[in-house]
Design a protein with these regions (language model features):
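Catalytic center-proximal scaffold of phosphoryl-transfer enzymes
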Residues: 2, 38, 125-127, 132-497
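Short, flexible loop/hinge motifs at secondary-structure junctions
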Residues: 1-153, 193, 222-223, 284, ...
Length: 497
C-alpha cells in the first residue's frame, strides 16, 4: 500500500513538473508575442517618454460635418413630398391653404443593385445604286469601336470590374464567378484570367514601360520586394518562391509612380536590370541585392534597423531597460521625434535641422556602438544588429545630407501592402503570364491612387479608348493616358472635400 501511495505521489509530482514547464513555455511565448506587438507599434509611433525634450504641438484639425464629407461626391436626386390638393384646408376655419415654400428634412443614400444588359452591336451598310447598275459593287459600312478583347463578349466596364474586384477589393476569381452568376452571367475563372492577361499585354504593359522610362529620370526611388508563389514557373518547383519587386517615386515627386516588377527569384541582377541607367538615390531596407548597382547612392531604412533592435530585446520586456538593444531603440526614437517635427518643411530646411539636431545624435549613436561592440557576443542578436548598423553606417547617414531622403522606406512598404493583402486571398498566380499581368495591373492601380484618381474609372477609360489608338503611327499618344497627364487628372481626379 505504501509503495502504491509513493508511486502515485511521484507520478503527480512528475505531472506537476511537466505542467509547470508548459506554463513557463507559454509565458515565454506570450512575452515574445507582446514584444512583437510592441515592435510593430513602434514602426508608426515613437515612445512617449522619449519625446519630453523634443516636443511639438499638433493642431487638431477641425472636423467638417460628417454627412457633408461622405455625401458631397454622390449624385443628389431631389424628392419633394406634397399634400394632396383636397387636404390643403385649414383645420381652424376651413379656408384653402396657400403655398409658402419647402424645407429640407434629411438625406437618404439609395443603393441600386448592379445589373447587366447585353449591347447588341450592329452597323449599317450603304451601297451606290448607280455603280451597281454598271455592274460595279461599291459599298460603305459604318465603323465600330475595336473590342477590348478580340473575339470576346466582355466590355471595358465588365473587365474593369473584374480587375478592380481582384486587385483593389481582393476578391479571388472563383468568388467573382459566383457574383457574376448571381447577376445572370456564367463566367469562368479561365475567361476572366485570360482577359486580364490579354489586357495587360495589349494596354497595361506598354503604359507601365513608359512609366518605367520616366521613373529613371527621377532623383530618388524607393525599392522593396515580397515573395509570391507561381505554380507553373518553368524550371522551378511549385513550392518555390518567386518575387514581386516594387519601385516607388518619393512623395515629393511631381509624377507619383509605383511600378511592380515580377521576377522568378531574388537575385541582385533583378534590381540591377530594372535600375539600369538610373543615377540617383535608392531608399532600401539594406538587402544586399540593392548594394551593387552602378551609379546609385544607397540610403538605408532606420525603421528596419530599429526593428532589428526590437527583435534583439529580451523576451521578458521588464528586464529590457538596461540592455544595449533598448538603449539603441531609445536613441533611434529621438531621431524619429525630430523627423516628426520637420515633416512639412522644405528639403533645404530639413537638411538644416538635421545637421543641427539629428547629426549629433547620429554621431553619438555610432560612437556609442563602436565603444560597446566588444561587450556582446558577435553571434548574439544584439551583436549581429550592431554589426548590421556599422556595416550600413554610410547609407543610414544619407538622410542627414539630403532633404529628399526620408528616414524610412515605409512609403514602399505601404505600396506593397495591397499586394500582400490580396495575396492572402488569391494565394498564388497560376502562370508567369498571370504574375506579369498582375504586376502591370498593380502598377497602374497604385499609381492611379497616388495621383488621386478613381481606379475603376481610370482602368475603364484605358480599356475603352486605348484599343482605338494607333500607337505605331503616333507613339507619343501613349503619354496622354498616363495617370498624371492633365487630361486624365481633369477627368478622373477625386476632388478633395
Amino acid at each position: 500500500m505504501a509503495d502504491s501511495t509513493t508511486g502515485t505521489i511521484e507520478n503527480l509530482a512528475l505531472v506537476m513538473a511537466n505542467l509547470s514547464h508548459s506554463i513557463e513555455e507559454l509565458k515565454a511565448t506570450i512575452a515574445s508575442l507582446n514584444s512583437t506587438i510592441d515592435s510593430l507599434k513602434a514602426e508608426n509611433e515613437c515612445e512617449p517618454k522619449l519625446l519630453e525634450d523634443i516636443s511639438y504641438t499638433r493642431t487638431k484639425k477641425k472636423q467638417k460635418g460628417k454627412i457633408d464629407i461622405k455625401l458631397d461626391n454622390l449624385k443628389h436626386v431631389k424628392k419633394v413630398y406634397d399634400i394632396d390638393e383636397k387636404d390643403r384646408v385649414c383645420d381652424e376655419c376651413g379656408s384653402k391653404l396657400s403655398y409658402v415654400g419647402e424645407e429640407f428634412v434629411r438625406h437618404e443614400v439609395i443603393y441600386e443593385p448592379a445589373k447587366l444588359y447585353v449591347k447588341d452591336i450592329y452597323r449599317k451598310t450603304y451601297e451606290c445604286r448607280n455603280c451597281r447598275k454598271k455592274g460595279k459593287a461599291v459599298m460603305l459600312k459604318a465603323g465600330t469601336p475595336q473590342p477590348v478583347v478580340p473575339h470576346s463578349y466582355t466590355s471595358p466596364s465588365v473587365l474593369s470590374q473584374v480587375i478592380i474586384d481582384k486587385y483593389v477589393n481582393h476578391m479571388p476569381l472563383y468568388r467573382q464567378k459566383s457574383e457574376w452568376k448571381r447577376l445572370g452571367m456564367e463566367l469562368s475563372r479561365t475567361n476572366m484570367a485570360n482577359w486580364i492577361i490579354i489586357a495587360a499585354k495589349e494596354y497595361f504593359i506598354p503604359l507601365v514601360n513608359r512609366m518605367h522610362e520616366l521613373m529613371m529620370k527621377e532623383s530618388h526611388i524607393h525599392c522593396d520586394e515580397t515573395p509570391v508563389q507561381v505554380l507553373n514557373e518553368p524550371g522551378k518547383k511549385v513550392t518555390s518562391k518567386s518575387y514581386m519587386w516594387v519601385y516607388s517615386s518619393i512623395k515629393e515627386s511631381k509624377r507619383p509612380v509605383k511600378i511592380f516588377d515580377y521576377r522568378p527569384d531574388r537575385k541582385a541582377t533583378n534590381p540591377q536590370e530594372f535600375l539600369k541607367g538610373f543615377d540617383g538615390t535608392i531608399i532600401t531596407d539594406g538587402y544586399y541585392g540593392y548594394n551593387h548597382i552602378d551609379g546609385v547612392t544607397n540610403a538605408y531604412c532606420w525603421a528596419h534597423a530599429r526593428r532589428k533592435f526590437y527583435d534583439a530585446l529580451p523576451v521578458d520586456m521588464k528586464n529590457a531597460s538596461d540592455t544595449l538593444a533598448n538603449t539603441a531603440v531609445e536613441k533611434i526614437a529621438r531621431l524619429f521625434a525630430i523627423e516628426k517635427q520637420i515633416e512639412t518643411l522644405s528639403p533645404d530646411k530639413k537638411v538644416k535641422v538635421r545637421q543641427e539636431k539629428s547629426k549629433p545624435l547620429v554621431d553619438d549613436f555610432f560612437s556609442w556602438y563602436k565603444d560597446n561592440q566588444n561587450k556582446v557576443l558577435t553571434a548574439s542578436k544584439t551583436g549581429k544588429t550592431i554589426q548590421y548598423a556599422l556595416n550600413y553606417e554610410a547609407g543610414l547617414r544619407s538622410f542627414l545630407e539630403d532633404g529628399l531622403v526620408p528616414m524610412t522606406n515605409s512609403l514602399d512598404e505601404r505600396t506593397i501592402r495591397p499586394f500582400t493583402v490580396g495575396r492572402k486571398n488569391w494565394l498564388f498566380s497560376t502562370s508567369t503570364k498571370g504574375a506579369e499581368a498582375s504586376a502591370a495591373v498593380f502598377s497602374l492601380i497604385e499609381t492611379a491612387k497616388s495621383n488621386k484618381l478613381n481606379p475603376y474609372d481610370y482602368i475603364e477609360f484605358i480599356l475603352d479608348y486605348l484599343p482605338q489608338q494607333d500607337l505605331v503611327e503616333d507613339p507619343e499618344r501613349l503619354d496622354w493616358f498616363l495617370p498624371w497627364s492633365e487630361e486624365i487628372k481633369e477627368k478622373f481626379e477625386i476632388k478633395a472635400d
